[in-house]
Amino acid sequence: AKPFPTFLPNPGMSTTPDTPPAAAKPLHKNETIKSERPFLRGPLLRDIADHSTGAITEDSGQLTKFHGIYGQDDRDLRNQRRKEGKEKAFSFMARIRVPGGVCTTAQWVALDALADSHANGTLKLTTRQAFQFHGILKGDLWRTINAVNRALLDTLAACGDVNRNVMCNPNPEQSALHAETMRVTKAIADHRLPRTRAYREIWVGDDLVAGGEPESEPIYGKTYLPRKFKIVVAVPPSNDVDIYAHDLGFIAIVDDSGKKLLGFNVTVGGG
């Protein structure tokens, strides 16, 4: 076999670059907000407690996405309220993270009651197997998210620049194979959750503990992701999760009996 050729520089040619390396570009404003607010805290509690407005600050609005919350306003009332010299009719949407779209009867009943008592009376089922409240007033926001957590559900990472709700076949009781893929779906969802303690400190009321383990995000880092990331798990022959429309897909490989999960084929780059 011929050896690889060795290329030597021309004696009259400089081996150093003519121009210095480009300086690192400054972070986009949204990335700066994430990096400068330790682990998605920011002034959220202060903003929620501010009764002078129905909205929150722009910076907090960038952080609440990671907590599953978006600010909204009633467009139909904009002109009327502007003429009256009032601010927009602000409210909030909260998205509940439901891996595989599975919840218990008790959880559904609790969410249905919250939709009537704290939102606009609707509970929406999204195309990505999550649930959404709309029309939550700021004064009801903490109580709503706290009640969702007391029902053993949460809104963490339902929105924002993180891995979103992980989808799977919507009927895990269809077979033992479907139940096994649902367990994998839940494991993926748990593994990709942000590790910040801010969510439970703010919405559940966990105490700040001094001297504990330093907080870190081993998967995401301090700026989390540049954009959202979506994962699905499919059980052939069904493609009910629309696997090619997502960033990362796992297609179950089964044995000849069709009952035992052997592994997964992996798809990437959808969306």
Protein language model features and the residues they cover:
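Small-residue-enriched alpha-helical segments and adjacent helix-cap loops
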Residues: 64, 91-258
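Iron-sulfur (Fe-S) cluster-binding modules
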Residues: 1-94, 110, 255-265, 271
